Every structure is written in C-alpha cells, then in structure tokens.
A protein has these predicted regions:
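Amphipathic alpha-helical interaction segments
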Residues: 14, 88-89, 140, 159
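Secreted/periplasmic proteins that engage bacterial cell-wall peptidoglycan
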Residues: 42-118
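Enriched - but not universal
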Residues: 9, 63, 83-84, 135, ...
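A residue-identity detector for tryptophan
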Residues: 6, 60, 80-81, 132, ...
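Aromatic- and glycine-rich peptidoglycan recognition patches
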Residues: 26, 121-182
Length: 182
C-alpha cells in the first residue's frame, strides 16, 4: 500500500492523536491514527501555499490553512469545527499539520484557522497562519492558557508579548486512512 500526500507529492508520516475523537460510530473515544507532517514537509507546503496566494489583493486564513493542511473545508473559519465533525477527526492534542480552529469572538467574528508547524511542549506550539497580522503570512507561538489544559483558550505571540485570550474549539486532524491507496 502506498501513502499519497495531501499536497504536492509530500510524504506523510502517521501519529496517534490521543485527544482526537471519532465523529461517528460506537468507538467515539478510541484514539485514531491521523496524518502528521515533518517540519520539512510543512515548510514545503507552506512555501507552495504562499506562492499561490502571493499577488492576491488580500490574504485570508481559510484558503491558506486549507492549502497548507490539506483539510478540505470551505466557508468561514467559525464553521470549520461543525463541518469537520462529519469529515475529519477533531480533538484537543496539537500535532504538526493539524488545524487550530479559533472560535468566533468580538475581535474575530468569523473565527480563525492556523496550522500547527511545531509542538514545543504540552502547552506551547508554533503555527503558520495567514492574516493574523493583516495581509501577511506569519509563524507565531501560541500558548494554551485554558484551566483544563484543553486548548480551549489560547494566546498568540504578537511581536514578543502574548496578546488577548482567544477562545478555540481545538484541532482538526487529517485522517491517515484518507491518504492510503493501492
């Protein structure tokens, strides 16, 4: 069996997302195998996605995250979590290549999506994202400040200091089994 990539011939490795939950069936609490991406693979996907959005009058988080992660969801970021429920595993454990899905808030009425580029420790990650800083693609540290350590409240590094607390749903994963073919 060959593993196909989610973007541009990039090889994918597999990882267990301990916080992932299956969206259907009787085994909703069983761990599931999801696609993880090496830093080099993510860098290449980010480069490819950046080239595709360059020259556009505006860079948006949704198409950028879709291109980088391979998670094929459309619509505003605040709709991704509910849409993912029928298509993709979701959970509260960051892994490289997963989409961090921010909830709507007063500051972000349409929500936000970013792709995990590095897991630093259990409460710190780095994400690659578009339009956190207007019309730019950036790599930023994100810390989990939720009382239950479930990534439901996060702060994003803004030039050396972590900004406001942002509500988040969690992580949307690319399932490994969708990558396999004969």
């Amino acid at each position: 069996m060959k593993v196909k990539s989610w973007i541009g011939g990039i090889a994918i490795s597999c990882a267990m997302a301990l916080g992932a939950q299956a969206s259907t069936g009787d085994h909703s609490n069983d761990p599931i195998v999801v696609a993880a991406v090496s830093p080099a693979e993510l860098q290449r996907a980010t480069h490819d996605a950046t080239r595709q959005v360059q020259g556009k009058s505006r860079i948006w988080c949704v198409p950028f995250a879709r291109l980088v992660s391979g998670v094929e969801i459309r619509g505003n970021a605040n709709t991704w979590w509910s849409q993912a429920g029928s298509q993709y595993p979701r959970g509260h454990t960051p892994i490289t290549g997963a989409v961090l899905n921010f909830r709507s808030s007063k500051a972000m009425p349409m929500g936000h999506v970013a792709v995990v580029s590095e897991v630093v420790d259990t409460r710190t990650i780095k994400v690659v994202q578009a339009n956190w800083t207007r019309n730019r693609i950036t790599v930023d540290a994100v810390i989990d400040v939720s009382p239950r350590n479930d990534w439901s409240q996060v702060r994003v590094d803004n030039g050396g200091s972590f900004g406001r607390v942002n509500p988040a749903y969690g992580f949307i994963y690319r399932p490994a089994e969708t990558l396999a073919s004969n």
